[in-house]
Amino acid sequence: MKVLFFDCFAGIAGDMTVAAMVELGLPLEHLRRELARLGLPASTYELAVEPVRRKGVAASHFEVRVEQDQPHRHYADIAAMIDGSSLAATVKDKAQRIFRRIAEAEAKVHGMEIGHVHFHEVGAVDSIIDIVGAAIGLDYLGIEAVYVSPLPLGSGYIETAHGRLPVPAPATAELLKGLPVHGNIGSGERVTPTGAAIVAALGTAFGSHPPMEIRSIGYGAGSKDFADMPNLLRLVLGETAETLQRDEIVVLETNIDDMNPELLGFLMERLFEKGALDVTFSPLQMKKNRPGTLVTVITPCAKRDELARLILSESTAIGVRYYPAQRLILSRTVEERLTSLGPVKVKVVTDDALLRRVVPEFEECRRLTAEKGLPLMDVYRIVEREVAGT
């Protein structure tokens, strides 16, 4: 399996991503041809890749040279541009997912509906090219899984169309929710909204370098030259024989023997609402021969403290154990399939690109039960029979 590791030791931006992909083998002419499919007037921009050095390390710098006056675009305009282009479906999907994440973050920050989001910096031609260019690069390089290191937050302030904002900018901070970050780095903006959106939308797993046989390394340079370290993004391209995806998680545990069982159900609901990957309750026989409950929560690393606090606030627990763990998971996607009962979402589980099973989503089956007046078991059987092997 071909994998790509984003080593964001100094940060990440869209132009740095494309530059590093060029070093990995993405031909600039291929990038130009594919970007032309967007329908942007060729006279309004020019692509350039130049060799540079950052703190003595050779790298490439990608630049989109544009006319000074750039129109600002609504999210709907950009989505329509991508959808109406002749780009490959896989490229469209990646680009749409990235822009969708940015639009959701902007909508949250500005308190508006996503359809009303108006892009400033991200809506300019250079940002559109950075995002679509990254999608083109991943497709050209044949990347099957994207791994991402913890992201440096940076510090200080930046000037934007909305005025002077703290680092990370509000939209960037929103995009970083749920991702591992750290503050052990100097001042300045280290992660741009475009860079954050690329890894947030397309990252398979976040954490340490995955096991692989390294085939190639590319360095993409940012425009600034930081004093504390080279302003570079390192992309590591490799092959892995593993057909399973590797993921780093945290396991939270606590023992409870003095809580109303009805409240445990509410605790489980709240934990899932806040991003827990799984929650289980197991019976225990505790000290003084009391029956109790072992609460076990599997969570993304970035959610550890938030969910631990939730356990302490919504239960009688006065302490929570935690330990890091790794898991191997089969690839899974949620897809919509057409059945005699109507369209239904199913979970498609694959192993090394081979179909393993198609599993009906419970909430979808419950919806169809209410709509069709059929028993839940019958709905399950119909959906399983009609989507098997599709």
UniProtKB/Swiss-Prot annotation:
<dbReference type="GO" id="GO:0016829">
    <property type="term" value="F:lyase activity"/>
</dbReference>
<keyword id="KW-0533">Nickel</keyword>
<dbReference type="GO" id="GO:0016151">
    <property type="term" value="F:nickel cation binding"/>
</dbReference>
<protein>
    <recommendedName>
        <fullName>Putative nickel insertion protein</fullName>
    </recommendedName>
</protein>
<dbReference type="Pfam" id="PF01969">
    <property type="entry name" value="Ni_insertion"/>
</dbReference>
<comment type="similarity">
    <text>Belongs to the LarC family.</text>
</comment>
<dbReference type="InterPro" id="IPR002822">
    <property type="entry name" value="Ni_insertion"/>
</dbReference>
